[in-house]
């Protein structure tokens, strides 16, 4: 597509969200230049602090904007399907909890590192200009009073500085610690809060087992969780048969914290006490200790901003606008949905052949209005899921309620779906994160009312009463919210990409 010299868009940050939106914009006729703080990740090995991420149809829908089946196919080729949780109890037993109503609804486990490399490559192929080693130091919007120019100042390794004058909007995708977000706050344009969990995380690799089919050292179809109340391990499969494990634990101020687990003896005692069955697949103790001592502790936090944009001049998206904890597996999906919504609005109100500041302002204002309540909702649900995975997944009564929930969504599919299904697979219709949160609270209340004294299995639930409760509590709320549960779609092939006029 021919490019108009007056449709320049600058993106600060070339991570997952920045690279995907850059690719979409460039392919649709805009001229995109990107500035990334770090050196080219394609030349740097993974740094041992990258949680495997989960892709669902909600996030993959953004890739359909390109009308290119290659992207979707490549996502499947780079990933491993995951159909549910496998809970490893402290007595050595296992319990399985399906994600969707059946095995046709699954998530994709993929390496963040590999996905970032893939999206960068595709963005460059499309014509995006990527500039690495550019750490944003300051942003000056003052010249916007008399011109359509913004001054960006970057620092580089060794202290050298670069001044870049850009025309057109600046989009911020520079992550949870976004420099651009801080500068917008310092300029009085918006405010935000950062809430850090007392827990942190470390990556621990489960090596592939050449003696097992495909080399998979654990069941490849599950998200494996070892819940131990004050700490837990999660593990997701990689395509080579290994698993990326993540230990979540207090960073400090606790006898069992990353700060206190330093010596070989302390680490060995900890794993032998709490994770003896995991040791069978984690490999030699020497390797576990090495990873615990060398891998950095990652921070977990939630960012909530009062606004995401400055008129038509600047707009934040992805983690830069609303970082969330990883416990619902929706950080990347939420960011990719941002890309879909933001592109759709820009293309409608400021198309590449007529990109005006007024049109961009309409697009960015609508983006903030639509995405903020949904970002806040998924942030809350992610924090709730942290407590669920740490404390509840090992509880027999909780597992009973989840089996009842699964029974109901199979028996009453058009009127009852789990919160998880609405969150992960509901993006194809009008089931927003906000709607999923509100409906999820009501449907879980129904489950709790059905699991009365004496009920020990899902088969004992009174389905006539369930039908009545659903009609009494859920159906009116769905009608009020204009939610259609039949729009919960896992298959990316069946997803539609709505226009902004039908969405807002």
Where are these regions (language model features)?
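Conserved N-terminal helical subregion
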Residues: 2-8, 56-203
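C-terminal helical "tail/cap" subdomain of flavin- and related membrane-associated enzymes
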Residues: 3-5, 344-504
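Conserved mid-domain beta->alpha element of the FAD-binding
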Residues: 14-23, 27, 296-384, 388, ...
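Conserved Rossmann-like nucleotide-cofactor binding loop
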Residues: 17, 21, 40, 177
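A short, Lys/Arg-enriched amphipathic alpha-helix followed by its capping loop at the start of a domain
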Residues: 21-30, 62-65, 126
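Glycine-rich FAD pyrophosphate-binding loop
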Residues: 26-48
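Generic enzyme active-site microenvironment
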Residues: 34-35, 172, 317
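Conserved FAD-binding catalytic core of PHBH/FMO-like flavoproteins
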Residues: 121, 149-300, 304-310
């Amino acid at each position: 597509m021919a490019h108009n010299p007056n449709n320049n868009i600058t993106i600060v940050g070339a991570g997952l969200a920045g690279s995907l939106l850059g690719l979409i914009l460039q392919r649709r006729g805009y001229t995109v230049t990107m500035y990334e703080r770090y050196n080219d990740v394609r030349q740097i090995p993974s740094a041992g602090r990258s949680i495997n991420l989960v892709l669902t149809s909600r996030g993959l829908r953004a890739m359909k904007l390109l009308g290119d089946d290659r992207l979707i196919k490549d996502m499947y080729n780079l990933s491993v399907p995951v159909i549910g949780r496998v809970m490893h109890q402290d007595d050595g037993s296992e319990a399985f909890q399906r994600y969707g109503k059946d095995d046709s609804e699954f998530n994709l486990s993929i390496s963040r590192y590999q996905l970032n490399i893939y999206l960068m490559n595709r963005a460059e192929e499309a014509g995006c200009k990527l500039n690495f080693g550019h750490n944003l130091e300051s942003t000056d919007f003052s010249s916007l009073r008399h011109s359509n120019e913004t001054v960006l100042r970057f620092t580089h390794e060794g202290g050298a500085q670069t001044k870049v004058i850009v025309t057109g909007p600046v989009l911020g995708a520079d992550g949870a610690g976004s420099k651009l977000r801080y500068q917008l706050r310092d300029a009085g344009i918006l405010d935000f809060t950062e809430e850090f969990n007392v827990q942190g995380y470390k990556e621990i690799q489960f090596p592939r087992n050449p003696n097992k089919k495909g080399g998979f050292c654990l069941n490849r179809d599950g998200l494996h969780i070892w819940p131990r109340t004050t700490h837990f391990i999660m593990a997701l499969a990689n395509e080579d048969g290994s698993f990326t494990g993540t230990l979540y634990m207090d960073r400090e101020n606790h006898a069992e914290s990353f700060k206190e687990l330093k010596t070989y003896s302390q680490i060995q005692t900890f794993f032998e006490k709490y994770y003896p069955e995991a040791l069978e697949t984690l490999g030699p103790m020497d390797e576990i200790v090495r990873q615990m001592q060398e891998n950095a502790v990652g921070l977990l936090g939630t960012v909530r901003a009062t606004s995401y944009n400055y008129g038509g001049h600047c707009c934040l998206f992805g983690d830069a606008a609303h970082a969330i904890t990883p416990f619902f597996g929706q950080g990347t999906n939420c960011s990719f949905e941002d890309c879909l919504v933001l592109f759709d609005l820009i293309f409608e109100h400021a198309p590449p052949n007529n990109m005006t500041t007024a049109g961009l302002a309409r697009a960015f204002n609508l983006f903030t209005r639509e995405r903020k309540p949904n970002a806040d909702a998924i942030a809350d649900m992610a924090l709730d899921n942290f407590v669920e995975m740490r404390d509840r997944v090992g509880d027999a009564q909780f597992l009973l309620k989840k089996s009842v929930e699964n029974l109901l969504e199979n028996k009453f599919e058009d009127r009852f779906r789990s919160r998880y299904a609405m969150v992960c697979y509901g993006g194809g219709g009008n089931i927003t994160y906000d709607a999923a949160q509100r409906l999820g609270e009501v449907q879980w209340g129904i489950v709790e009312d059905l699991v009365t004294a004496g009920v020990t299995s899902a088969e004992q639930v009174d389905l006539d009463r369930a039908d009545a409760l659903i009609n009494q509590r859920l159906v009116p709320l769905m009608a009020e919210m204009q939610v259609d549960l039949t729009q919960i779609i896992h298959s990316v092939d069946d997803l539609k990409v709505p226009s902004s006029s039908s969405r807002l």
